[in-house]
Curated annotation (Swiss-Prot):
SMART domains reported for this sequence: MUTSac (SM00534), MUTSd (SM00533)
Residue positions binding ATP: 637-644
Keywords: ATP-binding, DNA damage, DNA repair, DNA-binding, Nucleotide-binding
GO BP, sorted A to Z: mismatch repair
Protein name: DNA mismatch repair protein MutS
PANTHER family the record matches: DNA MISMATCH REPAIR PROTEIN MSH1, MITOCHONDRIAL, DNA MISMATCH REPAIR PROTEIN MUTS FAMILY MEMBER
Its biological purpose: This protein is involved in the repair of mismatches in DNA. It is possible that it carries out the mismatch recognition step. This protein has a weak ATPase activity.
Family per similarity comment: Belongs to the DNA mismatch repair MutS family.
CC terms in the record's Gene Ontology section: cytosol
Taxonomic lineage: Bacteria, Pseudomonadati, Chlamydiota, Chlamydiia, Parachlamydiales
GO molecular function, one term: ATP binding
Length: 858
């Protein structure tokens, strides 16, 4: 993304060389230059009739990126796209990381003499797309602002498509990074100084996904300016009512972001009607690597939801519910009472399955009312958007009545917020036809009888022959001339024709228009008026419908706050129904959640793997951790035996439990976990000059420096990225640190290949050995995937190599070398560290034989 910004700046430096000699440039191009100056580094789409045109470097860029023809007019490079198909082209550019400024004709060319006025009406960028194929129904599209005041980081993030606006503050850059990884903002706003000082933050995030960064001068984040902008926007006297008292950094970020969107990007922000603050301490902390390693929302394999925790538990019926479930997965709760409320709601729904079935069918009728309402408020809504909103609210009253029959305080509380908004719905249904056109002017939008003049114009436009027949009958009766005819031609328009022998019967108010050989043609004021109506009917229909629709949209927009309250309540209920269905489908049970210090799981299962491998019976496993004798479970066993699956399984069950979900286990009792850390596998970070081992140690250091006695730590194969002795030493000391360091005594699952670490159980209180059971028969093994108590001194590496398909010659030689090592190294006495009570530093006995040298001695 930074390369993209540099590319644009280079284009602009060339562009600035163009002279603006007014004597040599047309008025229209002067207008273009003014718009381009306002657009800045964005590609300018300049409206000219039915096309958007791009000039100079923008034209070159458009031609290259969209493979369009590049032409010239008076030596000015230009390229254009049709107005009606522009959305697809804009989406392609935004997907490539560009910003697109839209300069529209703000006057009607038919009513304007001379040059039509044009202005930049909006700027489209990754974080500001509103009606685009780039948007995912299941994910938010956040635009974030970052500032730092003293030692405090301020974060504000906004989804223009839903109206969600949040702020928070952080004291540690690592905490901020974890939160940004959770949010995945599509675009950032910050100061030049912040971007330069915290470049590593953006660089680290870019390892995961692409985004756009915009910078402003420092003064544009000044507190008083940001504070006043928010006060004026929300029309309040103080920000305390939003919970922002004393949050200087957050206010600076929030005010600067809204100001930037309105003043620089020309975006409507009137639909942003509230701002909410939160603290990351309200939720379980899941750092960046934990979210990634546990595949909470994105698969490591292809980045999709498939084979992730979210993919399993998200069975929501509405887009609002899907987006909320995404947040629930990444923000497990810490308050026991809140978890119990969700649990009780799930149990109540399970007890009323017939109601759940009805609710699901009703929820299918509900569209994305959150985003529909934002389009209404921002004046982007089409007739179809309004009718979709109408049909989405039709089942709300019935949904509410069903929910109020379920004995759950949590469900009833949210059901009460389901206002069917009958007046709003009547506004829409009384005005709009059930199947309106996609856009105004492309067909009938308003109902018959809604507007008298509109009905008359439609009748004129679509039924002129019938009108002429009726009028002819009327005039014949008035004049008594039975042969009188009413006709029309393009040259003279409408006329009344009578034969010459009937001329004396014509009334005085008839006006002679044309004389023919055998007849006379007349017009009347009524016929003249009708002719005028017919000739301008379509234009007038479009004008009236536009006025009516604009007024209707404003009236519906007045219900924005009410609609969003309904949307949020529906989303929460949708999520709870989803968790209910998952619990029923996969036989989950309700865990006991409290503030105790134990973590007990009986017959736990991996929530994702058991759904993927339905053809195999999943082997359940138990877990027992506490803050006394079972603080660290040391798990040994071969690769492919199921250690990593078990580690992830425990972490995922804990996360599910604190979401408020039931869990895949026979029983579970979980004391609140404040943070989950995982160190599972490593990938070389060569782009940043970091080896596998450096990444491993950096992540381990983060865990040791931030874990608490309430945390859950998952460590898989610590120390494997270096030599054997270094690896054993580091793994031992890490385990010992977690067992003995006050305030860091986290509940820990520690999987390792180093059988030497099993000695920890004898030497340090709190360590308990477990291993993955293996069945041996002759020279073959079977992985039982069962975690059992006790250590093991066998790695079965050669057996795993056989399963992987290594040549037999390699396997035979490996076996010879292994026997040689075991014979000569006396491995069982090679590593027996002892702890010094004073220094808590391990002392290691030097091995009697050098493994590596001995291997090559003959």
């Amino acid at each position: 993304m930074f390369i993209f910004q540099l590319k644009i700046s280079l284009f602009m430096s060339d562009f600035e060389q163009h002279s603006l000699d007014e004597s040599k440039i047309s008025p229209m191009m002067m207008q273009w230059h003014a718009c381009k100056k306002m657009a800045g580094d964005a590609i300018l789409f300049f409206r000219m009739g039915d096309f958007y045109e791009a000039f100079y470097e923008d034209a070159h860029l458009l031609s290259k990126e969209l493979e369009l023809t590049l032409t010239k007019r008076q030596e000015i490079p230009m390229s254009g796209i049709p107005f009606h198909t522009s959305e697809g082209y804009i989406d392609k550019l935004v997907a490539k990381g560009f910003r697109v400024a839209i300069a529209e004709q703000i006057e009607d060319p038919k009513k304007t003499k001379g040059l039509v006025k044009r202005e930049v009406v909006r700027v489209v960028s990754p974080g500001t797309v509103i009606n685009s194929s780039l948007l995912s129904d299941k994910n938010n599209n956040f635009f974030a602002a970052l500032v730092k005041v003293g030692q405090i980081f301020g974060l504000a993030f906004l989804d223009l498509t839903t109206g969600e606006y949040w702020v928070s503050e952080f004291t540690q850059e690592r905490e901020l990074l974890n939160e940004l990884y959770r949010l995945h903002p599509a675009e950032f706003l910050t100061s030049e100084k912040f971007k330069e000082k915290h470049a590593s933050l953006f660089e680290e995030m870019q390892q995961t996904y692409s985004f756009l960064v915009n910078t402003l001068e420092d003064w544009q984040f000044e507190h008083q300016q940001a504070h006043d902008f928010l006060i004026n926007h929300f029309k309040v006297q103080r920000l305390d009512g939003f919970g922002l008292s004393g949050m200087v950094a957050a206010i600076n970020a929030a005010g600067a972001l809204l100001n930037y969107l309105q003043e620089t990007l020309c975006l409507p922000i009137q639909h942003i009607q509230s701002i909410r603050c939160y603290s990351s301490s309200q939720f379980m902390m899941l750092d960046r690597m934990t979210q990634r390693n546990l595949e909470l929302t994105h698969s490591l394999q292809d980045g999709s939801r498939r084979h992730t925790l979210l993919g399993v538990i998200d069975q929501t019926q509405t887009p609002m519910g899907a987006r909320l479930m995404h947040h629930w997965v990444k923000q497990p709760l810490l308050k026991v009472s809140e978890i119990h409320q969700r649990q009780n709601g799930i149990q109540a729904l399970l007890n009323h399955e017939h109601i759940v079935d009805q609710l699901q069918n009703l929820f299918l009728q509900i569209k994305d009312i959150e985003r529909l309402m934002m389009k209404v408020s921002a004046c982007y809504a089409t007739p179809r958007d309004l009718i979709a909103l109408h049909f989405s609210f039709k089942p709300i009253a019935f949904i509410k009545s069903l929910l109020l029959n379920i004995p759950s305080e949590w469900i009833n509380e949210h059901a009460q917020k389901l206002d069917p908004l009958s007046k709003m719905n009547a506004l829409i249904s009384n005005a709009i036809v059930e199947e309106p056109p996609l856009r105004l002017g492309e067909g009938k939008t308003f109902r018959q009888g809604f507007h008298r003049e509109l009905d008359e114009l439609r009748e004129i436009s679509h039924d002129s022959k019938a009108w002429m027949a009726r009028y002819q009958t009327q005039i014949r009766e008035e004049t008594g001339i039975k042969t009188l005819k009413v006709g029309f031609n393009k040259m003279f328009g409408y006329f009344i024709e009578v034969s010459r022998g009937q001329i004396d019967k014509m009334p005085d108010h008839f006006i002679r228009r044309q004389t023919l050989v055998n007849a006379e043609r007349y017009i009347t004021p009524e016929l003249k008026e009708y002719e005028s109506k017919v000739l301008t009917a379509e234009e007038r229909i479009n004008s009236i419908e536009s006025e009516l629709f604009h007024q209707l949209r404003l009236e519906v927009a007045s219900y924005t706050k009410n609609v969003l309250e309904v949307a949020q309540a529906l989303a929460k209920i949708d999520c709870l129904i989803s968790l209910t269905n998952v619990a029923k489908k996969y036989c989950y049970t309700c865990p006991v959640i409290d503030d105790s210090s134990i973590l007990v799981i009986e017959e736990g299962r991996h929530p994702v793997i058991e759904t993927v491998c339905r053809h195999e019976k999943f082997i359940p496993n138990d877990t027992y951790l506490d803050d006394q004798a079972n603080r660290l479970l040391l798990i040994t066993g071969p690769n492919m035996a199921g250690k990593s699956t078990y580690l992830r399984q425990v972490a995922l069950i804990v996360i599910l439990a604190q979401i408020g979900s039931f869990v895949p286990a026979a029983k579970a009792h979980i004391g609140i976990i404040d943070k989950v850390f995982t160190r599972i596998g490593a990938s070389d970070d060569l782009s940043r000059g970091q080896s596998t081992f450096m990444v491993e140690m950096t992540e381990t250091a983060n865990i040791l420096n931030n874990a608490t006695s309430q945390s859950l730590v998952i460590l898989d194969e610590i120390g494997r990225g270096t030599s054997t002795y270094d690896g054993i030493s580091i793994a031992w000391s890490v385990a010992e640190y977690l067992l003995t360091t006050e305030k860091r005594m986290a509940k820990t699952l520690f999987a390792t290949h180093y059988w030497e670490l099993t000695k920890l159980e004898e030497k340090v209180p709190g360590a308990v050995n477990y291993n993955v059971a293996v069945h041996e028969a002759d020279d073959h093994i079977t992985f039982l995937r069962k975690i059992i108590k006790g250590g093991t001194d066998k790695s079965y590496g050669i057996h795993v190599a056989r399963l992987a398909g290594l040549p037999q010659a390699v396997l035979n030689r490996s076996k010879e070398i292994l026997e040689h090592l075991e014979e000569n190294a006396n491995r069982k006495s090679a590593f027996e560290p002892t702890r010094s009570k004073k220094s808590m530093v391990s002392k290691v006995k030097v091995p009697s034989t050098d493994f590596q040298l001995n291997l090559f001695q003959s």
